[in-house]
A protein has these predicted regions:
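Short cysteine-rich clusters marking metal-coordination/redox-active sites
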Residues: 41
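Bacterial signal peptide processing site
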Residues: 21-23
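Mid-length scaffold segments of soluble, non-membrane domains
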Residues: 65-105, 109-110
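Short, intrinsically disordered, charge-biased short linear motifs at domain edges
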Residues: 6, 25-33
């Protein structure tokens, strides 16, 4: 390939990348969507309204409908999972400091997950009965929750991958017996 062809190919790639970057910058952040009978959990494939506790909704590029999660922990796992490599536009979670009812936080409690404070490692579990990353709009509300329920207050980026991607209800120190396994 001659030098002119190489430079032309590089210029074409640069223009394409630039156009994609500009397109991504122009994507408008959607508003949170109210839960409805058609809100189905991404992983559990169950109606979200059947589960108690905080929820998450994730909005993706070129998808007019949010992806629902019956637990905030599952939404964070989706964001961090290497298999789920979608371009995210917005992530909303329930502000449990504003929720009048733990079981059903309400559609007026959605906040941007990037701005939330999370309590991890508390005695409270999520809608699927597993450990939860409990979101709050204010650090003071999260700290008050910790006083009553235990745990630690962190930001979204500080939640350990192992907390959301690791196994639940399994003693990780337990050795698995390979007796009888095909080797």
């Amino acid at each position: 390939m001659n030098i002119f062809a190489r430079l032309s190919a590089i210029a074409a790639m640069a223009i394409t990348i630039s156009a994609c970057s500009e397109q991504g910058a122009n994507i408008e952040m959607p508003l949170p969507v109210a839960l409805g009978e058609d809100s189905v959990g991404h992983y559990c494939n169950m109606t979200i309204l059947e589960h108690t506790g905080p929820k998450a909704q994730i909005h993706l590029v070129n998808n007019p409908h949010p992806i629902w999660f019956s637990q905030v922990r599952d939404g964070i796992a989706f964001l961090r999972s290497p298999e789920e490599n979608y371009e995210t536009v917005a992530v909303y979670v329930n502000d449990m400091g504003k929720a009048e009812d733990w079981d059903f936080p309400g559609d007026d409690t959605w906040i941007d997950a990037q701005k939330a404070w999370f309590v991890i490692g508390s005695a409270k579990t999520g809608g699927m009965g597993t450990p939860e990353a409990i979101p709050f709009g204010e650090e003071q509300s999260a700290s008050a929750f910790v006083t009553e329920n235990g745990g630690v207050v962190v930001r979204l980026a500080e939640i350990p991958d192992a907390y959301v991607l690791g196994p639940v209800g399994v003693d990780q120190k337990q050795e698995v017996s390979m007796t009888g396994a095909n080797q």
